[in-house]
A protein has these predicted regions:
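Substrate/cofactor-recognition hotspot
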Residues: 1-173
Length: 173
């Protein structure tokens, strides 16, 4: 079964802390054989992800997943569990991020973690669709030199969103 746009947005949120760029989303949607697991593995090998986790230990990486997904730190028991799994080589960081996000989505829709992730997915889809409306938008948001890397943080955007526009969708910092 092909990976959906929502599943791809989920991976962008987990690994990059931002919505998908239109070209990246289109690329993964056209790759009919790609699963969330294979995309997660690919994302973990990108310069963007490597830069994001550079110099961080497993606890910081796992906590980063919680911050990206839930706007909170990992609870101590959960953090210890994931760090032990990573230290023992049972799981990779890309597997842990995917498992944590999928577990939240598998919870009842009224749980705080599910609401956080689904709200972010809704906002991410809206953001990507808005960017995709113009070539200038696509060029400004895509790639390492894109606007999100330069101007968005300076303008009050965090993780590819603007607090005054998207916080109601769960992108709160």
């Amino acid at each position: 079964m092909a990976t959906t746009a929502s599943q791809i947005q989920q991976l962008y949120l987990v690994y990059f802390g931002r919505p998908a760029d239109p070209n990246g989303l289109s690329f993964w949607l056209s790759n009919q054989s790609a699963t969330q697991e294979t995309i997660a593995k690919e994302f973990a090998g990108t310069p963007e992800y490597k830069a994001k986790i550079a110099g961080k230990d497993f606890a910081q990486i796992v906590n980063g997943f919680y911050l990206s997904l839930f706007n909170r730190n990992a609870e101590p028991a959960g953090l210890n569990f994931w760090v032990n799994e990573l230290n023992q080589g049972k799981l990779s960081t890309e597997q842990v991020g995917l498992i944590i996000s999928n577990a939240a989505l598998a919870q009842a829709p009224t749980t705080v973690d599910n609401i956080s992730v689904t709200s972010k997915l809704t906002a991410a889809a809206s953001f990507t669709a808005e960017v995709n409306k113009s070539t200038a938008g696509i060029l400004a948001y895509s790639g390492q030199s894109g606007i999100m890397r330069r101007e968005l943080p300076a303008a009050g955007f965090h993780h590819g969103h603007h607090p005054q526009r998207c916080c109601h969708h769960g992108f709160r910092q």
